[in-house]
Structures are given as structure tokens and as C-alpha cells.
């Protein structure tokens, strides 16, 4: 196939899509160029599904190569290793709007690989990767119901910005990524500076309107490439099997969904499934039906039963009204030796959240393609198997845990103090101890309480809520504080975090078309009411940060010295700084601009270290009296150390009012003496006098 190119203007950027020259053995491949950021995005679809495959095996891998930024990776091996947190998050970002656009029965392996091969530090790879994935799938001839477009939206001075650069995002009040088809929004991911629901919804509609340029360009590209439509056909439904299944179940599934407790409801449904399968075992064998298909159709009936029930009765499977939030219980200071902690429980979802405060050196150094930087606010989310009553392997964080942790971090980021105002590295860890829906939002609530318990000066408390939507035709219901079952069986789920003032994070995933702006507006208003209710419940724990840090948290003292004095504080081979830290038991960080941060659990020790540093960096004042130690005896006098690294000469004539024949007769090395500074000459040499101190004392006595 000849090389085909499509170019269009997208905000301030020129975007070019190329296909037909590179990676021609992939099912679909496209080079995406956005200014100097260049990605190769490929899609490969298997010709058939694997035997026994019962789910859609879509894999998305986004990777940033260090050569893209003209850098060699750090570390021993000097090559890219496992996926970074950023790569994992962008992989999930691509997956979320693409997955719902494949038919339910499509079970062929599909792999998308997006590789950043050239990186303009001002143009991130996320939007080009989403565009490339959409184009590659459209070219691959899969039963993909796309293409999709994607846009990043900023907000500044009351105006939306399309695809802002990294520099523009630095002072933007919003960073929102939206993806969708020509008719529908499918995915929203955002971080905001406490904006209103109206501004957030406006950003979504603005981004969806602008992304039509992307969709049109991809459609033109596939036409020019002569892409053949997919020949895949969904397997025919087995009406006899479905009819037999419905008859065997009867009204029991509807009754099971009236059981309000999650585990009891799960057990009731499992018992029905087991009984039905045993009842139909003979017929399944006689008719040659596939047991896997029977299981799948049982799941489909579960889905329909729950949806019909909530649409008809407006009562949910746990008995709540549509907008009711589950009972909330909060505790703070639950772990005595941590620097801050909380226990947040909402229904059957629970999180223990801890805060650890460290110094700037405890920050995480990120070796990124665009350059190395340090992260001083860390948020880690853990989801152990016991939280859902299951056994499982304990290993490193999975993609889901990384994604949920990032969402929770976005939720509280808008209220965090600057590093200048609160010079600590802050690590938040959310341990999910129970889960039945929206553990990420429980992490937001728990982290807000734990931060206040730790005395971190957050601007305001933050709460998060997960919302759901069930829609059939014109009928729809919006659900507040969804359960795990409602998340899986609904048409839209979205999570909103924020303060009483506004939204700090919004994540939205939509599985169907037909979600109008009015529906989203209603859902956001219902979410606001739920968020305010949760904030009210959280106020029973804490309403503002504690005035004092934990007894076990390090106290930080910050002082500023002239950068030229840094070498004096460090000393030869680090001897001075090492001596101070060893003698005072403190940890000392020195920055290039002369900022020194002293950390110690003991406030007295921190003050002692501060005094030592101030001594070292202070200038010697003529006329001032110092207490010093005799460092060296010479024939013509003695050198006395009056400040660390600062020695002055007491000439033999300045030792005493009486005549001194031999310096060693009066002074010995190590003697502590009082001296007065007579002069500091242009070369920095210090003249001292013991005699002047004697004479001053004598004059005072008279």
C-alpha cells in the first residue's frame, strides 16, 4: 500500500496521520505527528478467538522511549524497563473509550501498542496516542464501532483552551481529557482547581465538539486506504437455551435481588445458578448446548433483572432510594505511631488511610523522557483480595490500583499546600479493607481526613462520590453512591471529587450512546448534593487541620543562606555537615538556592543544628567578642577558631597586658579563650585580641 497522509489543524497544533509506510504487517498502523511529538501506533487483531475464550482480551500498551527525548535511561541496564506510572495511566486512558465500542460477543485478541518515538516536551503523548489508537483500529478492519476522537481541554480567564501545551497547563485551572464518537462522549478524565459543575460540563461539550475534526480526518484516511469493513458476525442467539433458562429460574432471580446484604445476595444468586444448572444438565447434554453459553446467558438475565427492577420501582438492590448515600462512619487518629490516619466507612466500602511526612530528600525521583524531576506528593492505593472476601496473590500494584490511586490523588491535589508553604514530602497510603463500590472515592474522603489529622494545612475538606446511570429508551435513573453490582450493570459510571466550593476531579465512563447533555447535567447536580452530604458527615470527624503535627513527625526548620556560603556549611569532603547531623541527630537538606531545611523529631535538636549553621554562615563582626578555641601555637602568636571554619590570629602582643616572652607559656592548643575582633582585612584575615577583652573587663569593674 502506498503511503497515505492526512493533515489537519487542531488547536495550535498541526496533526499529521500517516499510514502505509511503517509497520505494514500489523492489522493497522499509523504514524501520528503533533508538532515534534511523533508516535507509532499499531493495532493487531487475531483472526479468530481462542478456544474457550469468555471475555474480550484487549491489551493496550503505551510506551515512551528515552531516545524520543534525546536521553539515555538511568539505572544499571541503561534501557527501558517495566511500564512507568505515567505509561500505565495513559494505557488505561486509551483502553477506556475503546473497549465499549467492540461488540459484546467479540472475543478475538486485540493489541494496541503506542510508542512515543520523538517528544516535544511541551506536547504530551496522551492525545496523539488516543488519536493513533482510533486510527489504527479503524484501519485494522475490526468490528470497531468507531472511530473516536480525543481532546484535551484547559480553562483560564473564563475561556476554554483546546489541547493546551504543558507550559499552558502550568497555570490552567483545568486539565480535562475527553474522548468519544461523533455522536457520544465515552470517557472523561480531569483534574480541576475547584470549578463549578457548569464549567466542567461546558469543557466536556467543548472538547466533544472540537474532536469532530479528528473523527473526520480518520474517516477520510480509512477511505483513501481502502480499508475493508469487518466480516465478523456475532454468533446467533440460542433461543431454546434462553427460554429453558428463563423457565428454570422463574421469579427467583428477582427475589434474590431483594436481598439487601451484598454477600447474602451473592450467595443467593450462586445457589440459584447452581440449582438451575443441575436442573438443566440433562437437557444441556441432550441438546449439545455449550455450558459456557448457559453461564453467559445467566449473567445476561442477572443484568436485565437488576436494571428492570430499578427502572420500574425506583428502589435499588440494597433498598435505597436513587439519591440516598449509604451510612457513613469516620474516625481519625486510629493508628498512634503514624503521622496522621483515618478510618472511613461508607456502607460496605471501607478504607484505612495513613499519612507519612518526610523531608524533601524523601521525594520520589522520576526519570522521565522529558527529563528528571522530583515528586513530593505521593498517593498509593492498595486493594487486597480480602477486601472483597476472596483469596488472591499479593504482588506489586496492578494497573487498576495505579489508576485508582491517581484518581484519588487528583481529588485532593487542588487543596494541597505548596512545597514552599509546607516543605514536607507527603505520602498518602489508602488500604482498602472492604469494598462494595467506589473504593477510590472512599480513598479521597479518607485521605482528606487523614491529612487534616496529620496537621497538613489543606485549604478545605474534600469528599468524593461515585454515580451511576441506568437507561432504557427514554427511561433513565441516576444513582448516587453506587454499589459494585450497580457499577457493572449500569450504562454510565462517573466519579466526582471536590470541596463545598467546587470540583477537583471528574472521571466519567459511558458505555452507550444517547447520554445527552441534560442527563449529564442532572447527574452532576445529584452528585453535588451527595458530595455535600458526605462532607457534612465527615465533619463529625474533623473540620480543619490540627494545629500541631504528630509527636512522631519530623519538625522542619527552614533557613536561607547566601549560596556562596553553601561550601562552608558542607565543609571539606562534607565534614562540617556530617559533624552537625551526627552531633544533633538531625537530617539536613541543602538546595542550590541556599535554602536549608533541618528535620528532626526533637525540636531542641533542630534549633541546635540551626544555631550551628547560623554560626558558620554569619560574618565575623569587628569589635565583637567571641569565645574561641586555640587551634595552633606559633612563635609570633596563636590562631584561635572563633566560628566553624574561621580562624583569627592573636598576635603575641595582643595576648595580655603583661609582657609575654613565650606564647606556649600562656596558651596551649585546645584552650578556650575570649577574644575581640580588631579587624577583618580585605583578604579576609582576622586580627584578634585577648588583651582588649581584659582591658574592657577592667574598665567595667572600675
Swiss-Prot record:
Reaction(s) the record says it catalyses: RNA(n+1) + phosphate = RNA(n) + a ribonucleoside 5'-diphosphate
Enzyme class label: transferase
Task: Tell me the GO BP annotations in alphabetical order.
Answer: mRNA catabolic process; RNA processing
Name of a matching Pfam family: PNPase
Domain S1 motif, by residue range, is 623-691
On the tree of life, the source organism's domain of life is Bacteria
An example of a GO molecular function for this protein is: 3'-5'-RNA exonuclease activity
Which cell locations does it reside in?
A: Cytoplasm
What residues does the KH domain cover?
A: 554-613
Q: Which cofactor does it need?
A: Mg(2+)
Which controlled-vocabulary keywords does the entry list? Cytoplasm, Magnesium, Metal-binding, Nucleotidyltransferase, RNA-binding, Transferase
EC assignment: 2.7.7.8
InterPro entries membership = ExoRNase_PH_dom1 (IPR001247), ExoRNase_PH_dom2 (IPR015847), ExoRNase_PH_dom2_sf (IPR036345), KH_dom (IPR004087), KH_dom_type_1 (IPR004088), KH_dom_type_1_sf (IPR036612), NA-bd_OB-fold (IPR012340), PNPase (IPR012162)
Q: Which family does it belong to?
A: Belongs to the polyribonucleotide nucleotidyltransferase family.
Q: How does it assemble?
A: Component of the RNA degradosome, which is a multiprotein complex involved in RNA processing and mRNA degradation.
HAMAP family in the record? PNPase
Give a short account of what the protein does.
Answer: Involved in mRNA degradation. Catalyzes the phosphorolysis of single-stranded polyribonucleotides processively in the 3'- to 5'-direction.
NCBIfam families from the UniProt entry: polynuc_phos, PRK11824.1
Which protein are we looking at?
Polyribonucleotide nucleotidyltransferase
Encoding gene (name): pnp
Amino acid at each position: 500500500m502506498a503511503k497515505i497522509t492526512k493533515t489537519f489543524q487542531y488547536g495550535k497544533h498541526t496533526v499529521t496521520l500517516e499510514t502505509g509506510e511503517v509497520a505494514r504487517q500489523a492489522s493497522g498502523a499509523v504514524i501520528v505527528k503533533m508538532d515534534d511529538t511523533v508516535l507509532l501506533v499499531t493495532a493487531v487483531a487475531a483472526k479468530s478467538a481462542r478456544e474457550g475464550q469468555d471475555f474480550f482480551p484487549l491489551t493496550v500498551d503505551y510506551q515512551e522511549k528515552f531516545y524520543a527525548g534525546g536521553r539515555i535511561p538511568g539505572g544499571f541496564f541503561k534501557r527501558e524497563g517495566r511500564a512507568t506510572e505515567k505509561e500505565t495511566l495513559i494505557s488505561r486512558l486509551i483502553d477506556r473509550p475503546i473497549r465499549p465500542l467492540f461488540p459484546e460477543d467479540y472475543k478475538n485478541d486485540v493489541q494496541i501498542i503506542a510508542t512515543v518515538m520523538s517528544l516535544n516536551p511541551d506536547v504530551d503523548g496522551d492525545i496523539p496516542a488516543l488519536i493513533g489508537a482510533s486510527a489504527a483500529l479503524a484501519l485494522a478492519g475490526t468490528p470497531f464501532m468507531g472511530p473516536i476522537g480525543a481532546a484535551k481541554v484547559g480553562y483560564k480567564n473564563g475561556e476554554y483552551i483546546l489541547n493546551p501545551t504543558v507550559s499552558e497547563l502550568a497555570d490552567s485551572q483545568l486539565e480535562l481529557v475527553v474522548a468519544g464518537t461523533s455522536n457520544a462522549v465515552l470517557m472523561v478524565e480531569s483534574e480541576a482547581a475547584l470549578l463549578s459543575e457548569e464549567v466542567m460540563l461546558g469543557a466536556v461539550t467543548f472538547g466533544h465538539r472540537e474532536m469532530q475534526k479528528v473523527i473526520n480526518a480518520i474517516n477520510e484516511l480509512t477511505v483513501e486506504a481502502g480499508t475493508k469493513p469487518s466480516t465478523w458476525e456475532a454468533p446467533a442467539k440460542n433461543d431454546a437455551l434462553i427460554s429453558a433458562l428463563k423457565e428454570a429460574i422463574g421469579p427467583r432471580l428477582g427475589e434474590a435481588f431483594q436481598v439487601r446484604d451484598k454477600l447474602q445476595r451473592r450467595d443467593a444468586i450462586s445457589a440459584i445458578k447452581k440449582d438451575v444448572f443441575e436442573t438443566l444438565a440433562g437437557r444441556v447434554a441432550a441438546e449439545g448446548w455449550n455450558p459456557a453459553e448457559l453461564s453467559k446467558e445467566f449473567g445476561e438475565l442477572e443484568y436485565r433483572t437488576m436494571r428492570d427492577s430499578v427502572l420500574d420501582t425506583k428502589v435499588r438492590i440494597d433498598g435505597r432510594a436513587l439519591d440516598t448515600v449509604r451510612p457513613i462512619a469516620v474516625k481519625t487518629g486510629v493508628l498512634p505511631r503514624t503521622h496522621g490516619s483515618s478510618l472511613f466507612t461508607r456502607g460496605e466500602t471501607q478504607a484505612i488511610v495513613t499519612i507519612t511526612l518526610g523531608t524533601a530528600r524523601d521525594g520520589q525521583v522520576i526519570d522521565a523522557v522529558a527529563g528528571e524531576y522530583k515528586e513530593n506528593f505521593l498517593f498509593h492505593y492498595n486493594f487486597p483480595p480480602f477486601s472483597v472476601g476472596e483469596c488472591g496473590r499479593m504482588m506489586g500494584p496492578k494497573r487498576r490500583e495505579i489508576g485508582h490511586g491517581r484518581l484519588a490523588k487528583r481529588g485532593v491535589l487542588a487543596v494541597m499546600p505548596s512545597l514552599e508553604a509546607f516543605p514536607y514530602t507527603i505520602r498518602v497510603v489508602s488500604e482498602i479493607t472492604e469494598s462494595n463500590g467506589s473504593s477510590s472515592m472512599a480513598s479521597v474522603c479518607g485521605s482528606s481526613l487523614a491529612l487534616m489529622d496529620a496537621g497538613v494545612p489543606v485549604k478545605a475538606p474534600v469528599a468524593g462520590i461515585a454515580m451511576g446511570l441506568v437507561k432504557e429508551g427514554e427511561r433513565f435513573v441516576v444513582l448516587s453512591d453506587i454499589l459494585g453490582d450497580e457499577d457493572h450493570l449500569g450504562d454510565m459510571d462517573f466519579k466526582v471529587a471536590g470541596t463545598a466550593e467546587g470540583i477537583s476531579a471528574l472521571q466519567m465512563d459511558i458505555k452507550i450512546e444517547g447520554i445527552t447533555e441534560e442527563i449529564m447535567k442532572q447527574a452532576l447536580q445529584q452528585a453535588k448534593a451527595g458530595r455535600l452530604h458526605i462532607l457534612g458527615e465527615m465533619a463529625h470527624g474533623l473540620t480543619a487541620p490540627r494545629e500541631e503535627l504528630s509527636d512522631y513527625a519530623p519538625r522542619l526548620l527552614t533557613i536561607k543562606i547566601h549560596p556562596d556560603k553553601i561550601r562552608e556549611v558542607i565543609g571539606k569532603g562534607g565534614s562540617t555537615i556530617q559533624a552537625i547531623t551526627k552531633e544533633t541527630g538531625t537530617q539536613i537538606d541543602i538546595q542550590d538556592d541556599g535554602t536549608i531545611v533541618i528535620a528532626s523529631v526533637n525540636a531542641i535538636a533542630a534549633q541546635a543544628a540551626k544555631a550551628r549553621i547560623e554560626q558558620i554562615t554569619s560574618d565575623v563582626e569587628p569589635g565583637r567578642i567571641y569565645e574561641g578555641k586555640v587551634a595552633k601555637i606559633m612563635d609570633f602568636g596563636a590562631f584561635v577558631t572563633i566560628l566553624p571554619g574561621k580562624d583569627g590570629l592573636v598576635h603575641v602582643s595582643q595576648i595580655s597586658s603583661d609582657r609575654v616572652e613565650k606564647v606556649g607559656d600562656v596558651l596551649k592548643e585546645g584552650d578556650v579563650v575570649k577574644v575581640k575582633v580588631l579587624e577583618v582585612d580585605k583578604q579576609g584575615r582576622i586580627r584578634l585580641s585577648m588583651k582588649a577583652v581584659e582591658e574592657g573587663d577592667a574598665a567595667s569593674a572600675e
